Amino acid sequence: MEKITLAPISRVEGEINLPGSKSLSNRALLLAALAKGTTKVTNLLDSDDIRHMLNALKALGVNYSLSEDKTVCTVEGVGGAFNWKNGLALFLGNAGTAMRPLTAALCLKGSSEAEVVLTGEPRMKERPIKHLVDALRQAGASVQYLENEGYPPVAIRNSGLKGGKVQIDGSISSQFLTALLMAAPLAEGDMEIEIIGELVSKPYIDITLAMMKDFGVKVENRNYQTFVVKGNQSYLSPEKYLVEGDASSASYFLAAGAIKGKVKVTGIGKNSIQGDRLFANVLEAMGAKITWGDDFIQAEQGKLKGVDMDMNHIPDAAMTIATAALFAEGETVIRNIYNWRVKETDRLTAMATELRKVGATVEEGEDFIRIQPLPLTQFQHAEIATYNDHRMAMCFSLIALSDTPVTILDPKCTAKTFPTYFTEFEKLSERT
């Protein structure tokens, strides 16, 4: 297996321009494909998850052209539901941001009835989709499970979404609601979506609503309990759509600056629509010096202390706090993060296991993780397993800010969101 060893870093300093956001890139491509008109999507992320979405759209008859560096995509919208030849199968890797929204969009009524199968890597078949399918069926959709009940692969007929009152469970993943919201304007009738349970990762819903608005569709949001969407609408191309830099990817660089130096990330700023920008507030609460601009966030080293916080609103970036916590004074508790368990891997167990390898004292709860700090000289050199999870690989690069090297197995798994991560991290790293 491939691996990379990072030697101890004495200081990090510099500026990094972030690649486009994964969540925004795949939403933008799907909305552009469903819209009337042609959309030029810029600062698109070039990564595995985006490639899976692009391949699926091509198979569904969507025409697009991609720039040589794959960051500009001009999409010719089909102006409504997709049409395809019966018997199509789409392989979506481990891309939740493609699987969930496409599951909903492919239920929309096509000009002639056809079936499509959505499948992916073995891990995708372990990632739940039941809450979304239950909701789609209430709206009249035809979706069947082909292997395990409640999980992909699924077979979908484009027999239409009728609208009406639909209840959806919001307690596991906000992607289910995002998928339903994005398909709802193209349903045959108005849809009233009621949330069952506590809606997790609310800021990701804000992203969805903001982007739908950019494509000409307004949703009535009643305090995140009920969402009302008029049916029989069309998305309209905004002609150009700029994808913000990935705020989750920013977290590693900001944390590095907070621990040992000064780092400025560009491509997101104080007006970003991504909830993960609020990661910087957590670093600030820990003692880092944070500066906000319209198009940048800068983190500078401060005396870090542990925090005890609910991080349900920033689940992806919260992982970075788990490794940063080792460099703080006092224990850190990250709470209300059950949905770590249904991501690329079970991130709660993975994080606890790998932190212990470097010498940390960790308590793993059902929906929380408690981490004790570690003196710089007491880190142990370990080989970190990454579980084919891009965020595990990136989080553990921070261990090199101690006095000990760290070895990361399968570093190329960062290709899911940030293929050049280790090169960029290296550019900011100074060694004595």
Swiss-Prot record:
It is an enzyme of class 2 (transferase). The keyword Glycoprotein does not apply. It is found in: Cytoplasm. Phosphoenolpyruvate binds at K22, G96, R127, Q175, R347, R391, K416. Its EC number is 2.5.1.19. GO terms for biological process: amino acid biosynthetic process; aromatic amino acid family biosynthetic process; chorismate biosynthetic process. Coiled coil: none annotated. 3-phosphoshikimate binds at K22, S23, R27, S173, S174, Q175, S201, D316, N339, K343. PANTHER family: AROM/DEHYDROQUINATE SYNTHASE, PENTAFUNCTIONAL AROM POLYPEPTIDE. Catalyzes the transfer of the enolpyruvyl moiety of phosphoenolpyruvate (PEP) to the 5-hydroxyl of shikimate-3-phosphate (S3P) to produce enolpyruvyl shikimate-3-phosphate and inorganic phosphate. HAMAP family: EPSP_synth (MF_00210). This is 3-phosphoshikimate 1-carboxyvinyltransferase. It comes from Actinobacillus pleuropneumoniae serotype 5b (strain L20). The gene is aroA.
